[in-house]
């Protein structure tokens, strides 16, 4: 009799423990869902191309400029920032050869071939360009570190050029991770905190920008509605802890460069047009795979084809090439001394 009573008591305790564990799981899931679905409530007004009230932020104080610059200075510097797994810190920025199939090479290479070095210098950012998946033993650099390296390298190149050639103009373009970097630099320049003055930037084009935001910059062609994955997944602590900080909207948008910054995004590309349901905090391996671009559908890899994005018969790379060519052809001709 006593033995049966003990068994019954043990069963009751086991049921209570199971119920308590289930309650904990439900509470954790509820908290995560609330965090994921709560509306953004930043301490500062949401970033936009203009601050509230339509008052344009004045650009930073411009550096004094001479009447002429050195004879070896190019009139224009084209900054090309490749995407994930399409660059290397050991590649030659003026003659990159390690990734001949890089998407950006379809733009930068024809430009370098068309214009002489006195008119145009094409600089392809050499950086690690990786995306470590913490659920795989891939020995890759983390997205945070790769993105920061690309940013530092590009800013230094532009700063060095501006110090040596203060009258040189700039054309900036990037793809995927490179588009995030290019967009961040454009945002800094347009808001008076960048490596060069905003009036020296002829234009910016971002292909598959992970921080794309509706109403910020100029949408080109058949872009879908939506926002970049870094905005959709903003403020998800689990990703930051994994070296994948999703940085959200750019503070101040593109500022004074808003009407000179183009956004290109293919329909179905979850990197630049990411609905909330495309990612799941409960399935981080799948989310990380999508973020790396390998599971963003075929769209993310096909901007050099007309399959998912075409404007007036041109692919995204053809459109960007023509856009950049026109900017270079019509750029100022600084005096040389």
Curated annotation (Swiss-Prot):
Amino-acid biosynthesis keyword on record: no
Regulation: Inhibited by tetrahydrolipstatin (THL), a specific lipase inhibitor.
InterPro entries on file: AB_hydrolase_fold, Cutinase/axe
Subcellular location: Cell membrane
Catalytic reactions on record: a butanoate ester + H2O = an aliphatic alcohol + butanoate + H(+)
Enzyme Commission numbers on file: 3.1.1.-
Keyword Heme carried by entry: no
Biased composition (Low complexity): 51-60
Knockout consequences: Essential, cannot be disrupted.
Pfam name, any one: Cutinase
SS bond partners: 73-165, 265-272
Molecular-function GO terms, alphabetical: carboxylic ester hydrolase activity
Keywords, comma-separated and alphabetical: Cell membrane, Disulfide bond, Hydrolase, Membrane, Serine esterase, Transmembrane, Transmembrane helix
Group of enzyme by EC: hydrolase
Coiled coil (UniProt feature): none
GO annotations of cellular component type: plasma membrane
Region described as Disordered: 41-70
SMART domains (UniProt xref): Cutinase (SM01110)
Superkingdom of origin: Bacteria
Active site: 176, 269, 300
Protein family per UniProt: Belongs to the cutinase family.
Task performed by this protein: Esterase that may be involved in cell wall biosynthesis and/or maintenance. Hydrolyzes pNP-butyrate (C4).
Protein name, as recorded: Carboxylesterase Culp6 homolog
Species for this entry: Mycolicibacterium smegmatis (strain ATCC 700084 / mc(2)155)
Organism phylogeny: Bacteria, Bacillati, Actinomycetota, Actinomycetes, Mycobacteriales
């Amino acid at each position: 009799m006593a033995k049966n009573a003990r068994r019954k008591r043990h069963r009751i305790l086991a049921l209570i423990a199971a119920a308590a564990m289930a309650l904990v799981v439900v509470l954790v899931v509820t908290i995560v869902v609330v965090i994921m679905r709560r509306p953004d409530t930043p301490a500062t007004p949401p970033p936009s191309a203009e601050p509230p009230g339509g008052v344009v932020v004045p650009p930073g104080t411009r550096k004094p400029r001479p009447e002429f610059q050195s004879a070896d200075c190019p009139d224009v510097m084209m900054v090309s920032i490749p995407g994930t797994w399409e660059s290397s810190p050991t590649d030659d920025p003026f003659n990159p050869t390690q990734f001949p199939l890089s998407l950006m090479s379809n733009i930068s290479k024809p430009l370098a071939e068309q214009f002489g070095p006195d008119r145009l210098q094409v600089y392809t950012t050499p950086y690690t360009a990786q995306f470590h998946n913490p659920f795989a033993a891939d020995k890759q650099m983390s997205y945070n570190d790769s993105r920061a390296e690309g940013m530092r390298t590009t800013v230094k190149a532009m700063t060095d050029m501006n110090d040596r050639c203060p009258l040189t103009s700039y054309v900036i373009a990037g793809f995927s991770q490179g588009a995030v970097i290019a967009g961040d630099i454009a945002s800094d320049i347009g808001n008076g905190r960048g490596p060069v003055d905003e009036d020296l930037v002829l234009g910016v084009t971002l292909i598959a920008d992970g921080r794309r935001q509706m109403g910020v910059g100029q949408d080109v062609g058949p872009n879908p509605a939506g926002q970049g994955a870094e905005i959709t997944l903003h403020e998800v602590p689990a990703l930051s802890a994994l070296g994948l900080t999703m940085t959200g909207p750019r503070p101040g948008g593109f500022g004074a460069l808003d009407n000179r910054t183009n956004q290109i995004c293919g329909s179905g590309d979850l990197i630049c047009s990411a609905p909330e349901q495309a990612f799941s905090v409960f399935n981080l391996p799948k989310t990380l795979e999508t973020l790396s671009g390998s599971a963003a559908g075929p769209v993310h890899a096909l901007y050099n084809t007309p399959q998912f994005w075409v404007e007036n018969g041109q692919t995204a790379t053809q459109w960007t090439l023509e856009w950049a060519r026109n900017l270079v052809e019509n750029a100022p001709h600084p005096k040389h001394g």
